Every structure is written in structure tokens, then in C-alpha cells.
Amino acid sequence: DMGSWDIYASALVTAPSGDPQYFFTTSCVPGMSYNFGAYDNPEVTALIEQLSREFDPAKRGELAVTLQQMILDDNAYVFCSFLQMNMISKENVKNYTAHACDYYQVTVDLDIT
């Protein structure tokens, strides 16, 4: 029940594929799964729709920056931290490179000898 709390804290890996659309689609569109605060800005929703139809990486980046600023200006979200990750492996794991998004940690070069 969204009316029963004053503040909500959540941790979310926002870019499992390195693309910003996941966060905007799930958290900034009315009725979507992670939009717990019922955020609703028709201009933001329209830009998210535009983002879903845009395939040029540079234009997608520009749209993402614009969307970020709009939700910050609306005070829709307060981004307060970033998870510090620790990596531990056995000595026989070779070519493992830590990355801020776990999607990129398993590569063709990763090997267990």
C-alpha cells in the first residue's frame, strides 16, 4: 500500500545490460513494477517511449541524460549511494576482470585451469 509509508529505500542494479532503458521503463512509468512512489510525469513518459524507439547509441545517450535530469528536477528519486563490490576467486580462475555491472564479468577470456 503506497499510502502507508513516507519514504522507501531500495537497492537496484539498474543496468543489467549496460543500457539505461531498463531503469526508466521499470521505475519511471506509471504502473510499472518498480515505480513504488507512483511517479508520473507525462513528458518523462513520452521521452521513455521515444527512447524505446531510438536505436542510435548517441541519441539514446542524450535522451538518457535528459531523462535523468528531469527525474532529478522532479525530486522523483534521491540517489544516495553506490554498492562497493568485493571479488574473490580461486587461483585457478584466469582473466577475470571486475566490472561495476556483473553482466560484463563473464567474458570469452574467462577461464578455469
Where do the model's predicted regions map?
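Periplasmic binding protein-like
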Residues: 1-28, 63-64
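Bilobed periplasmic-binding protein-like "clamshell/Venus-flytrap" ligand-binding domains
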Residues: 8-11, 55-90
